[in-house]
């Protein structure tokens, strides 16, 4: 994780998005965060998440936390699931079509998938960071 600059104001522009995208493409995970919060213990986690097609983001949930996604660039598929792995919602967020983001409620199984190279999401969720326990990942047959 990369943590924010600590500056009084940080402009989110193409230079920031391009730099983060280059780091995501070079990463084995095909994604990279730029955190605006200064530590994983902070109460509110705000970050950019550059996600490339093929990145593996397991189906997961946050039992006590909501999570918001806003697409800044590219197209992102968001899928939500029931406990048995059946799909509840399967939608594409695409700013050029007027679908900018979603708020995922507490305890909702979900994943995201980049459909375009260079996709970047702004994410916000309650902190502190909690590592997913084994029951925090849902195995879904594709």
Report residues per predicted region.
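Short acidic-glycine-tyrosine-enriched beta hairpin
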Residues: 82-107
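Conserved short histidine dyad/triad with adjacent acidic residue
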Residues: 48-64
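Double-stranded beta-helix
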Residues: 2, 12, 20, 86-92, ...
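Short glycine/proline-enriched turns and hinge-like loops at secondary-structure junctions
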Residues: 61-63, 70-71, 114-117
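A short, N-terminal "cap"/entry segment at the start of jelly-roll beta-barrel domains
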Residues: 1-44, 89-95, 141
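Short beta-strand His + acidic residue motifs that chelate non-heme Fe in jelly-roll/DSBH
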Residues: 59-60, 78-80, 101-104, 110-115, ...
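Glycine- and acidic-residue-biased ligand/ion/polar-headgroup-sensing regions
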Residues: 64-84
